[in-house]
């Protein structure tokens, strides 16, 4: 490990194993672009406040931009002997601009520096993930628009319950995605707060202008308390919670695709573009994409639980434990982005619904039983009485190996005299679905209206995409 800015206080060098354990350069290098931007803004603020000369600030900013260029072209790759990204950048800066490079850290601590870097990084990642969500939502909207009148069994307890429009089913996931976008947008507001200038924990005696730095970096507000500013990782937890919910929603859809692609359901087939085979069984076509998305969900949950556990016992202010915030959030963001991208491709070109199988599926069960009860309700029969009547009818059908449509009207009247020939039209799957026309229901008119509202919301979130 090379000498560090704090080594003057110590007589003995750090044990190599401890140095390696202490170092974060192996993962916090991901923050380098944001560290460079934050440092450049800090240098400009120091000159603006009269702490550095304009010439000194220009030298610092020029050196930082040189490091950025070297990083992007692969010329600058800090080794593992560096403690962290901040020291690696500072050391290279001194090599490039000389002694003035040592002035960059004036009125700044790594504590407020890393908080600034992480917020800048997360702000950009949130924007990227919201963009990915937008593309995913667009794919679901387009798919749903093609299947307003395609019927599919609806389930509760994984038992067939009532038939629904396939578009209505897909709209449920669009609603989940809408909440995900709203959550991330709200979290971004709390991320977009500048802690730079808080120092190690107590601020600084130098006449800095924190508002100036915040404006340069695009922050909309300043942190109000220096102790809280350097130790706050609420925004990390919030992001990990939001990422976990996105993963939950993708995992639920993945589970359904896995089920629907199975021989037991056969509601859809997987295309060759989004499936894999078996190394042993030549007939297999495996749903690897949704399985991996489902698997990554547990890993994202783990990062959330890990961060909560790190924070639960920390006294104010900064503690080294907070170094553990980065690997989890970096991995969670990557996992969510890759899952959204893969699921978008899967929904766009990886599945083909089987309309004949779906049409048959809604005809072969008792999912129209509730509508038979509603038929009696419309005839003036109390619902609880109607419920009992239809329960008895279903029990009779099960013993007779018949469906509701198979019973002659005379048998229906044996159970209740209010039944008439118009019953059969009332319990066909298409009639059953179309009749559920309450707001938010699966009736075709309601589904078309819901698609219109979802489309309007999508265009509100992504106006530039809507223009193309």
UniProtKB/Swiss-Prot annotation:
One of its GO terms (biological process) is L-arginine biosynthetic process. It comes from the Bacteria. GO terms for molecular function: argininosuccinate lyase activity. It is an enzyme of class 4 (lyase). Gene3D superfamilies: Fumarase/aspartase (C-terminal domain), Fumarase/aspartase (Central domain), Fumarase/aspartase (N-terminal domain). SUPFAM superfamilies: L-aspartase-like (SSF48557). It catalyses: 2-(N(omega)-L-arginino)succinate = fumarate + L-arginine. Keywords: Amino-acid biosynthesis, Arginine biosynthesis, Cytoplasm, Lyase. GO terms for cellular component: cytosol. It is found in: Cytoplasm. Pathway: Amino-acid biosynthesis; L-arginine biosynthesis; L-arginine from L-ornithine and carbamoyl phosphate: step 3/3. Its EC number is 4.3.2.1. The keyword Cytoplasm applies. Transmembrane segments: none annotated. Pfam families: ASL_C2, Lyase_1. Belongs to the lyase 1 family. Argininosuccinate lyase subfamily. NCBIfam families: argH. HAMAP family: Arg_succ_lyase (MF_00006). This is Argininosuccinate lyase. It comes from Gloeobacter violaceus (strain ATCC 29082 / PCC 7421).
């Amino acid at each position: 490990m090379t000498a560090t800015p704090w080594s003057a206080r110590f007589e003995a060098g750090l044990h190599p194993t401890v140095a390696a354990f202490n170092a974060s350069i192996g993962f916090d290098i991901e923050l380098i672009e944001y560290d460079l931007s934050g440092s450049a803004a800090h240098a400009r603020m120091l000159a603006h406040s009269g702490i550095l000369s304009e010439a000194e600030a220009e030298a610092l900013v020029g050196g930082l931009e040189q490091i950025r260029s070297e990083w992007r072209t692969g010329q600058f790759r800090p080794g593992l002997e560096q403690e962290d990204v901040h020291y690696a950048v500072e050391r290279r800066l001194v090599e490039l601009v000389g002694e003035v490079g040592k002035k960059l850290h004036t009125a700044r601590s790594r504590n407020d520096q890393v908080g600034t870097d992480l917020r800048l990084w997360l702000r950009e990642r949130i924007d990227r993930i919201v963009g990915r969500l937008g593309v995913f939502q667009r794919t679901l909207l387009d798919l749903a628009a093609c299947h307003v009148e395609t019927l599919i069994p609806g389930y509760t307890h994984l038992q067939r319950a009532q038939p629904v429009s396939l578009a209505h089913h897909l709209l449920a996931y669009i609603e989940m995605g809408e909440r995900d976008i709203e959550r991330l947008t709200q979290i971004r507001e709390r991320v977009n707060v500048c802690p730079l200038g808080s120092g190690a924990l107590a601020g600084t005696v130098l006449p800095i202008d924190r508002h100036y730095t915040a404006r340069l970096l695009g922050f909309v507000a300043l942190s109000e308390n220096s102790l809280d500013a350097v130790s706050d990782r609420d925004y990390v937890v919030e992001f990990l919670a939001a990422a976990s919910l996105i993963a939950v929603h993708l995992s639920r859809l993945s589970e359904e695709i896995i089920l629907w692609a199975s021989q037991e359901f056969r509601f859809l087939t997987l295309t060759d573009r989004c499936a894999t085979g078996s190394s042993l069984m030549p007939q297999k076509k495996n749903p690897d994409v949704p399985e991996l998305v489902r698997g990554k969900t547990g890993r994202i949950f783990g990062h959330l639980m890990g961060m909560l556990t790190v924070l639960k016992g920390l006294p104010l202010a900064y503690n080294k434990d907070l170094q553990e915030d980065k690997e989890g959030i970096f991995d969670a963001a990557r996992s969510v982005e890759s899952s959204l991208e893969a699921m978008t491709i899967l929904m766009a070109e990886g599945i083909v619904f089987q309309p004949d199988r779906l049409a048959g599926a809604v005809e072969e069960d008792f999912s129209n039983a509730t509508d038979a009860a509603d038929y009696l309700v419309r005839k003036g029969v109390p619902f609880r009485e109607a419920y009992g009547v239809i329960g008895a009818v279903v029990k009779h059908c099960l013993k007779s190996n018949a469906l509701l449509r198979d019973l002659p009207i005379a048998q229906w009247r044996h159970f209740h005299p209010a039944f008439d020939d118009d019953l059969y039209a009332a319990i066909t799957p298409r009639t059953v679905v179309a009749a559920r026309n309450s707001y938010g229901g699966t009736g075709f008119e309601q589904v078309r209206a819901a698609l219109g509202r979802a489309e309007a919301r999508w265009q509100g979130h992504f106006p530039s995409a809507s223009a193309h």
